[in-house]
């Protein structure tokens, strides 16, 4: 069953509207980004989503384990999505916290997989100027050689959501193509995506 994640939420009113939709995961960005949230914002947003039984994912880039663990505790995160490489030791510590770990692989011309990945799932995203939220896609045919479950991110919108589904991704991660302003998601665009996926 395909699941959806909307990433880069930072507005509480927006979050309350989104929480009513059939979306499984919501992403809060703790790394440097126009969509970055403070710990206080994260706590409030997380409470909104948990009230509707949604999963909350913290997005990190270079943050150390101590910072990540603090965010997990303070914002009651269900999982983390991280751009730097997670070590075996870090993965074991995170498992004790009862959170899932998504390792991001930034793709340009090849999948460029590390020999061993310590994560529950790999998230493939397009390599861009920013670490995520660039609104660009990579060549999804590259995923044909990957045999494990994965998450797909990068430039997914109404124009290519069916193509994204055909990659076999277990979770689609949507962000900038669903915005009117940085961090404000367009509810109507998301409803259109949900309608398309029912076809």
From Swiss-Prot:
One of its GO terms (biological process) is L-tryptophan biosynthetic process. GO terms for molecular function: phosphoribosylanthranilate isomerase activity. Transmembrane segments: none annotated. Keywords: Amino-acid biosynthesis, Aromatic amino acid biosynthesis, Isomerase, Tryptophan biosynthesis. It holds the Pfam family PRAI. The keyword Amino-acid biosynthesis applies. Belongs to the TrpF family. PANTHER family: N-(5'-PHOSPHORIBOSYL)ANTHRANILATE ISOMERASE. This is N-(5'-phosphoribosyl)anthranilate isomerase. It comes from Campylobacter jejuni subsp. jejuni serotype O:2 (strain ATCC 700819 / NCTC 11168).
């Amino acid at each position: 069953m395909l699941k959806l994640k909307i990433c880069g939420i930072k507005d509480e009113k927006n979050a309350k509207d989104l929480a009513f939709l059939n979306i499984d995961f919501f992403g809060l960005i703790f790394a440097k980004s126009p969509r970055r949230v403070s710990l206080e914002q994260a706590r409030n947003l997380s409470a909104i989503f948990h009230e509707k039984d949604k999963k909350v994912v913290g997005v990190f880039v270079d943050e150390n384990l101590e910072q990540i663990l603090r965010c997990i505790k303070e914002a009651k995160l269900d999982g983390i999505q991280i751009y730097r490489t997670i070590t075996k030791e870090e993965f074991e510590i995170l498992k004790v916290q009862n959170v899932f770990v998504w390792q991001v692989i930034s793709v340009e011309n090849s999948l460029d997989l590390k020999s061993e990945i310590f994560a529950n799932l790999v998230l493939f995203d397009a390599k861009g100027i920013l670490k995520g939220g660039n609104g660009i896609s990579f060549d999804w045919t590259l995923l044909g050689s990957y045999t494990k479950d994965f998450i797909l991110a990068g430039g997914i919108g109404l124009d290519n959501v069916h193509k994204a589904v055909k990659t076999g991704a277990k979770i689609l991660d949507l962000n900038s193509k669903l915005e009117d302003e940085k961090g404000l998601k367009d509810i109507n665009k998301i409803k259109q995506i949900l309608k398309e996926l029912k076809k």
